[in-house]
A protein has these predicted regions:
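Periplasmic-binding protein-like
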Residues: 65, 141-148, 221, 225-263, ...
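Acidic, polar ligand-binding/catalytic clefts
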Residues: 88, 92, 97-159, 232, ...
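Bacterial lipoprotein signal-peptidase II cleavage site
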Residues: 13-14, 27-44
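Extended ligand-binding regions for polar small-molecule ligands
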Residues: 84-93, 154, 158-159, 163-172, ...
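Extracytoplasmic small-molecule ligand-binding "clamshell" domains
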Residues: 45, 50-123, 271, 280
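A ligand-binding cleft/hinge motif common to bilobed small-molecule-binding domains
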Residues: 107, 123-132, 176-179, 207-243
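Bilobed "Venus flytrap"/periplasmic-binding protein-like clamshell domains
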Residues: 65-68, 79-89, 124, 145-200, ...
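Short helix-initiation/N-cap motifs at beta->coil->alpha
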Residues: 84-85, 99-110, 192-207, 244
Length: 291
């Protein structure tokens, strides 16, 4: 064999090896690129699924539709109020749809435990109920007060002896007058009434007071303030029945949803949105979250 032929064959063989190696490398590179594309698509799909899950979520808030300024129907037939505004902002920040679900207050536990609502958010007193629900942090300081007609001669709690007093069924006002634990003073007060009438809602109570069917109403101070601003001929006693706090009540054990809502409320406190909503409803002096 000639020397030139020998080197030509060696060169041709070497070139073939290089080409084969290049093809393997290229295929490997294409495979890596394909794997990377597939991984990226999976991540995008997962993120899209999460976004869709959030956007599809309904947040169903159970509330008393006759409990201003926390939740009620306005003159336009819309459900409005401080608590509903807070819930709306929480939903907006989480991509949820808010469903405002009016409930009978004395059926609230059944609604919550059956899953008909996600939470009770409407001037809901946590004081004395701490172990019955999974609670948010308290966000309003509340007082239970007494409202009477002007000129009735009732100026202090003791003047309620022998009187007919109205209170909402299954309310914190009723609990303040009937709870047996560490409540001797209020139990004595309630025993002095000629009658303690339970009504379905406070609008009914105020109509009964105006008509003279009852002598006084035991009610939350926020509701009393709202009613006294929109009605004439009523007065609020300086004496308070009890002080307490409002919070959002979730089904016992539903900590995941509670934590999501609470973290959003905390964000709203930090950026000032919570205080802005409180100012809108003249409740700045009563809110306590973040203070």
């Amino acid at each position: 064999m000639k020397k030139e032929d020998f080197f030509m064959k060696r060169a041709t063989g070497f070139a073939a090896v290089l080409m084969a190696a290049a093809m393997v490398f290229t295929m490997a590179g294409c495979g890596s690129s394909k794997d990377a594309d597939t991984s990226a698509k999976k991540e995008t799909k997962t993120e899209d699924s999460k976004d869709k899950e959030n956007s599809d979520k309904q947040f169903i808030v159970g509330f008393d539709a006759e409990y201003p300024p926390y939740g009620y129907k306005d003159d336009n037939g819309e459900y409005v109020g401080f608590d509903l505004d807070l819930a709306q902002e929480v939903c907006a920040r989480n991509g949820w749809e808010l469903v405002k679900q009016p409930i009978d207050w004395d059926s609230k536990d059944m609604e919550l435990n059956s899953g008909s609502i996600d939470c009770i958010w409407n001037g809901f007193t946590m004081t004395g109920r701490e172990d019955d629900y999974t609670w948010s942090k308290p966000y309003v300081d509340n007082s239970i007060v007494v409202v009477v007609k002007e000129g009735s001669g009732i100026e202090k709690k003791e003047d309620l002896a022998g009187k007919v007093v109205a209170v909402q069924a299954d309310s914190s006002g009723l609990a303040a007058l009937t709870d047996e634990e560490d409540n001797e003073e209020n139990l004595k007060l309630a025993a002095s009434f000629s009658d303690l009438q339970q009504v379905a809602d406070y609008n009914t109570a105020f109509m009964n007071l105006e008509a003279g069917a009852v002598d006084a109403i035991v009610v939350d101070i926020g509701v009393a303030d709202y009613q006294l601003e929109s009605r004439t001929g009523f007065a609020m006693l300086d004496d308070k029945i009890r002080t307490e706090q409002y919070a959002v009540g979730f089904k016992l054990g539903n900590e995941e949803l509670r934590d999501r809502v609470q973290s959003t409320l905390d964000e709203m406190v930090k950026d000032g949105t919570f205080d802005d909503i409180a100012k809108k409803w003249d409740l700045s002096d009563m809110v306590c979250l973040g203070k």
